[in-house]
Amino acid sequence: ARVAGYSSSVGRPVSIGPMTPAMKRLVQAGLDMHLKTMDWMKAGIKAKEVVKKFYEYGDKIGVSKNILYGPCHGLGMMEVERPWMESRSEYFLEENMTFQVDTFLYCEDFGLRWENGTIIRKDGVETLSSKLNEIIELEG
């Protein structure tokens, strides 16, 4: 969606029909990583620290092999733009910076994305969409 020339995105995994237990575990792991990433972000934090926690948490819950990329990228005139959060990102998060928290996990059979726009605030983030941060299974 674009508003006044600015772009954003919202991503949610949706299953048509019931998920297998393995699928549901991976989708839940993605949601957990996604929400924790937003918890770790606030003004004054070095970007690479968010990335470090993201990958450490992926190791802890056993999904590091399923991470395609992550955890965040800039948001502005294009949906995906600088700055990216990477393990070597030396910049500090500053108030009013905008990021897409973009959690992408995959396995042999499927992939999933959780994505929310955020604004960096002094004590955390303001999410641009908090709707449907839950596992969605539609009848098939």
Which ranges hold each PLM region?
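Active-site neighborhoods and metal-handling regions in enzymes and metal-associated proteins
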Residues: 1-140
